[in-house]
Amino acid sequence: DVITGESSGVVIKSTSTDFVVGDTVAAHMGWQSHLVANADDPRLMKVDLDNGSLSAHLGVVGMPGRTAYFGLTEVGKPQPGETLVVAAASGAVGSAVGQIAKIKGLRAVGIAGGPEKCRYVKEELKFDACIDYKADNFAAELAAACPDGVDIYFENVGGDVTKAVALLLNPGARVPICGYISNYNDEDIANSQTPMRILKGLDPEPENRFFVVTEWRDRWVEATRQLGSWIQDGRLKYRESIGVDLESAPKYFRGMLKGKNFGKQLIKVADED
């Protein structure tokens, strides 16, 4: 079986009037170099390179960007002047979340692993602060960066990071749960410190829910255009980690789970021409 995943590419043969040779597309084609698809497959869509490069349509204007956009605006419900904290802030989703929060008038505090990633988040992405979760005084530094508490916590990590943020949540806080990567390799997932279990232990329990971006599939074009516009305006920046050759994909996937990537992890399987 083909491992699932999104890809972008160019149509090289078509019998459809909806897709012609040379069209640039994104599709849920998995880890493979070629795909035969039906034109009416909802997972196949044309991409406008004015909104970003082919690779960007797998990142900041693709699924990760749309995840950030809808997770923050629809689940997080941001209001100007609030404080947002986002874990994995240098990654594809987290970096977009914080920048969108800044566009919306919020204070954005990122959490990332290591000085280099934190420097990138603060200096290049213009977050108000970024805290290194590997630091010995992580919890104290996070509290100092959020003097007015936390109104929105965009969850990507789980575990000890979530425990530290949970202590700072204000009444009425919202927690969009995108993922919890620190728990994925737990042998006993039923008893691991997932964000849902941690948040349920608070009194009162903050508003929270796990979401998937396909909930807003009918609005994907809206999100892509808005994200593309912010890129063109210079308000939304991104970074990519691109490996070469499909055979190397497992190595880079394992590295991503360990936080070795910087930005969206991609694999280039062929040249566009």
Named regions from a protein language model:
Residues 58-136:
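Mid-domain Rossmann-like dinucleotide-binding core that forms the NAD(H)/NADP(H) cofactor-binding site
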Residues 233-242, 250-273:
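C-terminal capping/lid region of NAD(P)-dependent oxidoreductase domains
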Residues 18-19, 78, 169, 191:
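Short, well-ordered loop/turn sites that connect or cap secondary structure elements
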Residues 1-31:
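Glycine-rich beta-strand-centered segment in the early N-terminal region that forms part
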Residues 137-148:
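Short amphipathic alpha-helix with an adjacent loop that forms part of the alpha/beta core around
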Residues 104, 160-236, 269-273:
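Glycine-rich phosphate-binding loop and adjacent beta-alpha segment
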Residues 20, 51-54, 77-83, 147-150:
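Short helix-loop-beta connector
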